């Protein structure tokens, strides 16, 4: 597709609209504006045109403005307060500053489209300009009521350290890498971290490129409020009924909720069974005063489910060696004596909780630093001063539904 063909045929440059659905209302809350070119037989995405740095900037800006104006004309025709998501290249945006992008928005503001309906989607991964200038401009747009969305999160090029500094309104997370439930745990952990970050800075999570129900369930489970992708609706020339997927989403979410409730109940039952088992084992071996001897007895009882045992005091200092299950036998790792683990997330909080409730705690799934496997840890109060930690093996988690 030649750039000049597009520039000399702007009449056939058109906006397409991809609906964005909400978790709380189960309906369309806005549209992302996407550029298309009609060549006489099919509609061709203008994405490659806009991202081709060999095409002069003024040409790309001109076509961008045509798509934007035609899209805003369409939004003027409908009497609904829908959000308008607009993509902009950070370099082009800054080189033109607020002219002509802001001029168009102000022009349509006078026609009835308030600035608080716009969401500017921007990716700064390949931005070559001064970050301070970009920050200043984006903050200025926010003072006008325009929302800022950081795009392309979930890619390797994501600058996660910049999110807190920019404090965007929306984090837009790409789920293309999560096309099956075999996607790496590391990728899923990064997305989970993004959901925590969004909560901390008061941003809304929007998950895009949802192409299958598994991705929708992941987005829902990880705090996604907005959803977008071919599984829900493809980009089209026309707007859709806001409630087009209301029944479908309600049905899907009911399944997600039922599955999650069952998973939570399973975890509760497993935690209770661990609690009862540990009460029996502690009572059985309570006469063993030396912790290494006590842990040695536990290895015989827990050989099929655990690979590491150790005991810490209430401040996180290890008061026993590790008993670690190697390839064929349990070994004592005395070098771990007196190490302190209070820096670990939730460590002291969990110690306090166990001391008050006098019950054990089953951790979330996490990747063990030393062996690299996904594991869980069951922590159990031996007294108000000392606490037992049992690292459960991946094989055990894999063999028990709901633990992974």
What is each stretch, according to the model?
Residues 1-52, 366:
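Active-site core of bacterial EAL-family cyclic-dinucleotide phosphodiesterase domains
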Residues 2-7, 14-15, 51-58, 77-83, ...:
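Intrinsically disordered, low-complexity terminal regulatory regions
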Residues 13-17, 361, 370-380:
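A short beta-strand signature within small-molecule sensing/ligand-binding domains used
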Residues 62-133:
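Catalytic core of bacterial c-di-GMP phosphodiesterases, primarily the EAL and HD-GYP domains
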Residues 111-179, 204-220, 226-232:
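The catalytic core of metal-dependent phosphodiesterases that act on cyclic dinucleotides
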Residues 186-266:
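Contiguous mid-protein beta-loop-alpha structural module that forms a pocket-lining wall or clamp
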Residues 327-364:
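Extracytoplasmic/periplasmic sensor domains and loops in membrane signaling proteins
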Residues 375-404:
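Conserved beta-strands of PAS-like sensory domains
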């Amino acid at each position: 597709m030649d750039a000049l063909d597009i520039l000399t045929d702007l009449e056939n440059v058109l906006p397409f609209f991809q609906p964005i659905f909400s978790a709380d209302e189960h309906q369309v809350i806005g549209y992302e504006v996407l550029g298309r070119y009609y060549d006489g037989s099919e509609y061709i995405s203008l994405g490659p045109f806009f991202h081709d740095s060999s095409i002069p900037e003024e040409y790309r800006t001109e076509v961008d403005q045509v798509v934007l104006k035609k899209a805003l004309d369409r939004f003027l025709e409908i009497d609904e307060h829908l959000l308008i998501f607009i993509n902009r290249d950070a370099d082009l945006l800054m080189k033109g500053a607020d002219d002509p992008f802001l001029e168009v928005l102000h022009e349509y503001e006078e026609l009835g489209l308030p600035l608080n309906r716009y969401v500017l989607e921007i990716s700064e991964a390949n931005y070559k300009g001064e970050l301070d200038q970009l920050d200043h401009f984006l903050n200025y747009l926010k003072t006008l009521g325009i929302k800022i969305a950081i795009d392309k999160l979930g890619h390797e090029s994501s600058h996660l350290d910049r999110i807190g500094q920019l404090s965007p309104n929306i984090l837009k997370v790409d789920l293309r890498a999560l096309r099956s439930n075999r996607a790496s745990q590391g990728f899923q952990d990064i997305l989970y971290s993004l959901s925590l970050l969004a909560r901390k800075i008061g941003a809304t999570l929007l998950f895009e490129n949802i192409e299958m129900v598994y991705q929708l369930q992941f987005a829902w489970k990880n705090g996604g409020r907005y959803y977008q992708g071919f599984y829900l609706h493809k980009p089209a020339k026309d707007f859709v009924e806001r409630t087009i997927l209301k029944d479908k989403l309600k049905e899907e979410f009911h399944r997600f909720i039922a599955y999650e409730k069952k998973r939570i109940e399973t975890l509760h039952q497993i935690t209770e069974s661990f609690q009862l088992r540990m009460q029996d084992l502690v009572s059985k071996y309570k006469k063993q005063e030396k912790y290494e001897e006590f842990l040695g007895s536990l290895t015989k009882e827990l050989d099929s489910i655990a690979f590491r045992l150790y005991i810490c005091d209430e401040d996180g200092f290890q008061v026993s060696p590790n008993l670690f299950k190697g390839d064929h036998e349990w070994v004592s790792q005395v070098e771990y004596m007196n190490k302190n683990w209070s820096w670990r997330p939730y460590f002291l909080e969990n110690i306090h909780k166990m001391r008050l409730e006098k019950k054990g705690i089953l951790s979330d799934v996490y990747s063990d630093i030393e062996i690299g496997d996904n594991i869980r840890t069951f922590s159990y109060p031996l007294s108000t001063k000392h606490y037992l930690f049992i690292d459960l093996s991946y094989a055990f988690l894999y063999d028990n539904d709901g633990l992974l």
